[in-house]
Amino acid sequence: MNKLLIGLVNVYKKFISPILPPTCRYYPTCSSYMIDALKKHGAILGLIMGLARILRCNPFIKGGVDPVPDYFTLRRNPHPERYEDEIIAQAFHSNKK
């Protein structure tokens, strides 16, 4: 089941996403987040987390770095500054404007 869901997301990333304008306000993108959540938390919890992330991604939020947390939650990652890609995390969360 997990491989099927990851395959469906990859089909979306390869064939559907390129013809749509970029709208994701987060890093990693919602489709990459879904794949990471499926790998980290399995088919059921990963799918729920991925869908919750898609619902959070809308024009009324700021966005930013939101990696998949190590535990199941429907909320945004409370410690995005600990993201493994420090350069990207700093770019999104620096105090400089």
UniProtKB/Swiss-Prot annotation:
Top-level taxon in the UniProt lineage: Bacteria
Main localization, broad class: membrane
Membrane topology reported for the UniProt record: Peripheral membrane protein
CC terms in the record's Gene Ontology section: plasma membrane
Coiled coil: none
Subcellular location: Cell membrane
UniProt cross-references to Pfam families, sorted A to Z: YidD
Protein keywords: Cell membrane, Membrane
Membrane as UniProt keyword: yes
InterPro entries in alphabetical order: Membr_insert_effic_factor_YidD
HAMAP family from the UniProt entry: UPF0161_YidD
Family (UniProt): Belongs to the UPF0161 family.
Function of the molecule: Could be involved in insertion of integral membrane proteins into the membrane.
Protein name, UniProt field: Putative membrane protein insertion efficiency factor
Organism: Lactobacillus johnsonii (strain CNCM I-12250 / La1 / NCC 533)
